């Protein structure tokens, strides 16, 4: 007799497979950007002949070549993903790890996850439609902003986190949150698709922030809002100490000043940069500029 967890996993996989096949037009080949079609093997590109499998209800656009990646995060996560360690981390990420990190870097000025999610939701205003959640983890923010009028599609490189997120979605009865495994630098979506985008907690780990933001920008509609939570060099909070910033850099992170972030955001095609700090935790908004003709 199948265990309760096995039944849940099967239900998640079946419902997501059905949604992927019915959603049509959302996904595009991350390599050649042409539309993908559902097939018996997953999602197929008729132009470059690539096939992307669907693993437990989650399309996998990343593949298995982790060792040769120039992205340190992909090498680390890819080689350890779906092991006992990452499965455990995924199960406690939202209740223990994430709040601890925000409290540590926020210091006396730290904001709760509830407050940060509220800030992100405010940036999106009352906008509905499709929302892109970049480096979504277990849908920490996406699940909190999803609604009857908002469908959230989260991308991450860690399958364990997204499988945990799919379990949360099932348990919390949130029908409008979906996941895909992909890199921010090569998003598997057609251009001008999303009504808004969010990225909470991972901007500091992107190898090339401008490249990542440009790719996010590509997938958004003109005038669409962007909401980001990251860590920054600010006069309050732990990041004001050089030793802490150096340690973050050695671990693959990049700590920017608010001015540096604004410059990169504008360079990537956004405008109207507006920051708000909680210690070294920064929430900022921006908006995609008008389409060039």
Q: Can you say where each PLM-predicted feature lies in the sequence?
A:
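Short alpha-helix
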Residues: 253-268
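N-terminal auxiliary segments of SAM/dcSAM-dependent transferases
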Residues: 2-84
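A short acidic, Gly/Pro-enriched loop at the edge of an enzyme's catalytic core
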Residues: 185-196
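A short glycine-rich, Lys/Arg-flanked "PGG" loop and its adjoining helix->strand segment in the class I
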Residues: 210-222
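A short SAM/SAH-binding and catalytic strip from SAM-dependent methyltransferases
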Residues: 196-208
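Class I SAM-dependent methyltransferase SAM/SAH-binding core
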Residues: 130-186
């Amino acid at each position: 007799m199948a265990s309760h967890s096995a039944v849940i996993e099967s239900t998640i996989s079946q419902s997501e497979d059905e949604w992927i096949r019915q959603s049509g037009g959302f996904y595009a080949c991350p390599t050649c950007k042409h539309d993908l079609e559902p097939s018996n093997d997953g999602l197929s590109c008729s132009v470059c002949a690539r096939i992307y499998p669907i693993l437990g209800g989650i399309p996998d656009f990343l593949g298995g070549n982790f060792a040769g990646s120039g992205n340190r995060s992909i090498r680390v996560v890819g080689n350890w993903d779906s092991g006992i360690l990452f499965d455990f981390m995924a199960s406690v990420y939202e209740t223990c790890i994430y709040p601890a990190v925000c409290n540590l870097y926020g210091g006396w000025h730290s904001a709760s996850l509830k407050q940060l999610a509220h800030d992100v939701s405010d940036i999106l205003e009352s906008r509905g439609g499709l929302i892109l959640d970049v480096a979504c983890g277990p849908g920490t923010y996406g699940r909190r902003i999803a609604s009857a009028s908002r469908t959230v599609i989260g991308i991450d490189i860690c399958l364990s986190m997204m499988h945990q997120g799919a379990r949360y979605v099932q348990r919390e009865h949130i029908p409008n949150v979906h996941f895909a495994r992909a890199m921010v630098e090569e998003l598997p979506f057609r251009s001008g698709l999303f009504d808004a985008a969010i990225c909470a907690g991972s901007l500091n780990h992107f190898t090339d922030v401008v490249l990542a933001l440009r790719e996010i920008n590509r997938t958004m509609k003109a005038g669409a809002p962007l909401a980001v939570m990251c860590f920054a060099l600010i006069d309050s909070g732990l990041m004001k100490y050089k030793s802490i910033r150096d340690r973050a850099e050695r671990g693959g992170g990049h700590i920017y000043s608010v001015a540096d972030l604004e410059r990169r955001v504008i360079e990537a095609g956004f405008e109207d940069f507006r920051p708000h700090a909680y210690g070294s935790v920064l929430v900022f908004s921006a908006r995609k500029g008008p389409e060039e003709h």
